[in-house]
Amino acid sequence: FIDMHVHLRDPGFEEKETIETGCRAAAHGGYTTILAMPNTKPVVDNPDVVNYVHNKAKTVGLVNVLQVGAVTKNQEGKELADIEGMVKAGIPAISEDGKSVMNAQLYREAMEKAAKLGIVVLAHCEDKNLVNGGVMNEDEHARELGLKGITNSVEDIIVARDIMLSHDTGAKLHLCHCSTEDSVMMVDLAKQKN
């Protein structure tokens, strides 16, 4: 049983979770393997941080911990992280976790590297430029509550882009948190084409 999206928060945010508490929770839930997201402090964007997590997880020893590497340095979306070095350290995937790389050319380069290195790209599809202060799905309930909504296009646009880049580069793509009808339709169509 594998959980592909956990937050161990170590290093840097141990007040939220530690590798040991996360592994204990996973084992208690019946999981044997977990993939840890890179949103730590420092961000998992180089082999040293990957090795830190893997070594600490081996000491805990309750479940297999596979560390996911960041796509960009410090998850800032400006420059690619040391993807090759992290692959040598054992990452199975890259992700910007919780955000999309908004620079499509940079993301394409990351996908090209991922395809060449045989790792998966885990994508959180959300166009941050369209979120515009929204806090929930834009619908009647949001209006009743007086809250700014987020349209489905925030997700759909990035899903379409990421599927096209995956097709162009040959990268293996896993979309995290798909929530719209059109996103699911695009995934189904992409599966039919490949």
Set out the residue ranges of the language-model regions.
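Glycine-centered flexibility sites
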Residues: 12, 22, 29-30, 69, ...
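Active-site mouth loops of central-metabolism enzymes
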Residues: 4-17, 40, 66-79, 145-153
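Metal-associated gating/positioning segment near the N- to mid-region
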Residues: 1-60
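Hydrophobic alpha-helical hairpins/lids featuring a short glycine-rich hinge
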Residues: 39, 56, 60-81, 87-89, ...
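Glycine-/small-residue-rich active-site loops that bind phosphorylated ligands and cofactors
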Residues: 14, 41-45, 74-75, 99-102, ...
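Histidine/acidic residue-rich metal-binding segments in metalloenzymes
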Residues: 80-194
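Hydrophobic faces of well-ordered beta-strands that scaffold small-molecule active sites
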Residues: 2-6, 34-36, 65-69, 94-95, ...
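Alpha-helix-loop-beta-strand connector modules within alpha/beta enzyme cores
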Residues: 47-68, 112-126
